Amino acid sequence: MPNGYSIGDPIIQVKNVSLKLGGNQILRDLSFDILDILREGATTGQIVGLLGPSGIGKTQLFRILAGLNKPDSGEVLIGHPGAPVQRGMVGVVAQHYPLFEHRTVWSNLMVAGAHSGKPQADRERRANDLLDRFKLLDRKDHYPAQLSGGQRQRIAIGQQIMCSEQFLLMDEPFSGLDCVALDAVQELINEVTHAHELNTTIIVSHDISAVCEIADQVVLLGREPDENGKQIPGAKVMAKYDLGEMGLAWRKGITADPDFHRLLEEIRQRFPLL
């Protein structure tokens, strides 16, 4: 384990979650913990990737983690010692970064912050801090249609930080992006997550490289084979990788590390079998 790196208590616990839709088993006894990560002398959060091929049930798991849907059985606990997840406990960033088009940037943030239950003055201070950090103070009176794609992303993420300062859940944030845009989104996710040691960003995606390049932990979802090699319906956790413990958590130049490429190849080889 790298010097100065240690693992703390579970901050998200997924316990035996199962879900059926239309008679089809989508998730089956799915369990994993997301553990707090501590780095000596560093103030930084963590990024966790939930990886799986298309159609494996990632969207349904996303909604359960966000408290938007309930599983048929099992539970999701948030924080330490752990409380059942409820809508609003986790900030949710949808795939296409939806905003209130008829409201200004400032109003978008303040409407989102109203769900936090914090006093007006605290919400205004938080919104100003976010706009300053995202270099958008001069856009606070603009409408979403006047923003670039990258600026919209920042405001959509800012909305969710206004709601939940600790947990951020992102659905396929890299989908359909070219290399330049993908790099910008990765940089933004790193910036938001590492701004505070309590922050945890969970990325649900099928993009192996984009997730592993910035993740501290990766959970691989898939369907377990039976004794004849036939897939049993319902996604489970097939593997979990602690990239921090492996010395492969995000750092400058990680993509040039041969061990990092071996990890990518291992995951890529498993994907078709999931």
Q: Model segments located where?
A:
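The feature captures the beta-strand-to-loop junction immediately N-terminal to the Walker
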Residues: 51-53
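Helix-to-loop junction immediately C-terminal to a conserved catalytic motif
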Residues: 66
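Short coil-to-helix segment of the ABC ATPase nucleotide-binding domain corresponding to the Q-loop/switch region
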Residues: 103-110
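Conserved ABC ATPase "signature" region
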Residues: 110, 121-139, 189-191
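Conserved signature/switch motifs of ABC ATPase nucleotide-binding domains
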Residues: 142, 163
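Conserved ABC ATPase signature
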Residues: 143-147, 151
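Catalytic Walker B motif of ABC-type/P-loop ATPase nucleotide-binding domains
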Residues: 168-172
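Helical segment within the ABC ATPase nucleotide-binding domain
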Residues: 182-197
